[in-house]
């Protein structure tokens, strides 16, 4: 699913539920932010909306990294059954870069719906358990950057570190 930050406002209600309900397949939300704003009605930071919705966010610093992060986001979503946001900003969205396109394997999942009120019924009785499961998913996802080479700089040395994301990290 793709949208700009203003579209995320419209999609906020189903987004909040999607994290609790989880997904049965990979679900990547690309939400383009516009710091400034240069080409949007408002300036927003969708990372705050993702934090509120309790979903992970990947913040690419270039078109090439955005392409790489799409695969990471899909794998993360599949592994943890949760929506994952990729958040490029204006400078990434309005730039070009050569990337190597990979073959996309055909999907193998089938569309089926199994009645499961404990998962799909939006009632307080079931939501509490889903909340606990979501918090557990997020704890496991928090360890993910340690195993993702794209998110680390192996050439870094020294006793101090600057943590940055997106274009500021480039």
Summary of predicted features, one role per range:
Residues 1-78:
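Thiamine diphosphate
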């Amino acid at each position: 699913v793709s949208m700009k930050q203003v579209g995320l406002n419209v999609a906020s209600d189903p987004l909040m539920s999607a994290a609790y309900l989880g997904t049965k397949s990979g679900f990547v939300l690309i939400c383009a932010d516009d710091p400034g704003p240069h080409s949007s009605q408002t300036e927003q930071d969708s990372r705050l909306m993702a934090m509120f919705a309790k979903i992970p966010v990947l913040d690419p610093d270039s078109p090439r990294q955005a392409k790489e992060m799409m695969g990471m986001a899909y794998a993360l979503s599949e592994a943890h059954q949760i929506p994952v946001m990729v958040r490029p900003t204006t400078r990434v969205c309005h730039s070009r870069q050569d990337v190597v396109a990979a073959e996309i394997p055909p999907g193998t999942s089938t569309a089926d719906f199994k009645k499961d009120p404990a998962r799909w019924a939006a009632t307080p009785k079931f939501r509490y358990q889903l909340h606990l499961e979501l918090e557990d998913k997020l704890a496991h996802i928090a360890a993910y950057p340690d195993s993702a080479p794209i998110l680390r700089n192996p050439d870094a040395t020294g006793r101090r570190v600057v943590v940055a994301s997106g274009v500021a990290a480039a």
